[in-house]
């Protein structure tokens, strides 16, 4: 896929999060890597009205254009630390949030869940350290 096709794909998937109740209209963010470019949702964007041309370009070296998501540094770190990562989707799904509220790790009870995700740790990272610690935790 070329850059423009990937931008369209990212916007569609970001909208689907909202349409399927896995994100509210203005929280979370998403990005994809295209060579040394990282295209990310703008800070405060609305999933319902986001267009491919609204995505903001950042670079693997850490440079960011104005308007990039407040979590752009986190996305950049994920790509720097995991060269196989092609996309990052960060949502605030109500079910995922509810599962983490007691602080226990999530262990699926169904066969398929156990097969694909036998153990999903709940990771607590202080806000001031999340850019440094989160990329390693999800790698």
Regions found by a protein language model. Give the residues of each.
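Glycine-rich flexible loops
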Residues: 1-139
